[in-house]
Amino acid sequence: MRTLWIVAVLLVGEGSLIQLWEMIFQEMGKGAAKKYGLYGCNCGMGHRGRPVDATDRCCSVHKCCYKKLTDCDPKTDRYSYSWENGAIVCGGDDPCRKEVCECDKATTICFRDNLDTYDKKYKIYLKFLCKKPEPC
């Protein structure tokens, strides 16, 4: 349980972290979520710089997605989702919560689709090496 909490705190530093972690776990298997906690310039807390690769870009896009949700609080909004025929389906009647879910869904799919770009040298990346971030 402690590991789950640590991963949730490190993963993106905001949002319904447990739900995002669960999505990544369900999509990619045990241990996948902890790979991204401190990855590159944008995974973990903050939006530190230009993405180092496509995997890091997934985190950058996720943070930008959250920033666009001006009438929502992605840091606390819990949402509902399900798995249908192997796909994540965001549900519920609240449009804000559904948008938070869609941001997390897109990130999960992005990680899956860019697994081949994951580079262990960026797993725990020193953020001072990051270049100025791209605007959202």
From Swiss-Prot:
Residues spanning the signal sequence: 1-15
Keyword Secreted: yes
Keyword line: Disulfide bond, Hydrolase, Lipid degradation, Lipid metabolism, Secreted, Signal
Enzyme class: hydrolase
Source taxon at top rank: Eukaryota
GO cellular component: extracellular region
GO MF annotations in UniProt: calcium ion binding; calcium-dependent phospholipase A2 activity; phospholipid binding
Active site (catalytic residues): 62, 104
Record bears the keyword Signal: yes
Pfam families: Phospholip_A2_1
Disulfide bonds: 41-130, 43-59, 58-110, 64-136, 65-103, 72-96, 90-101
EC number: 3.1.1.4
Tissue distribution: Expressed by the venom gland.
GO terms under biological process: arachidonate secretion; lipid catabolic process; phospholipid metabolic process
Catalyzed reaction equations: a 1,2-diacyl-sn-glycero-3-phosphocholine + H2O = a 1-acyl-sn-glycero-3-phosphocholine + a fatty acid + H(+)
Gene3D superfamilies for this protein: Phospholipase A2 domain
Subcellular location: Secreted
Family: Belongs to the phospholipase A2 family. Group II subfamily. K49 sub-subfamily.
Main function: PLA2 catalyzes the calcium-dependent hydrolysis of the 2-acyl groups in 3-sn-phosphoglycerides.
The name this protein goes by in its record: Basic phospholipase A2 Tgc-K49
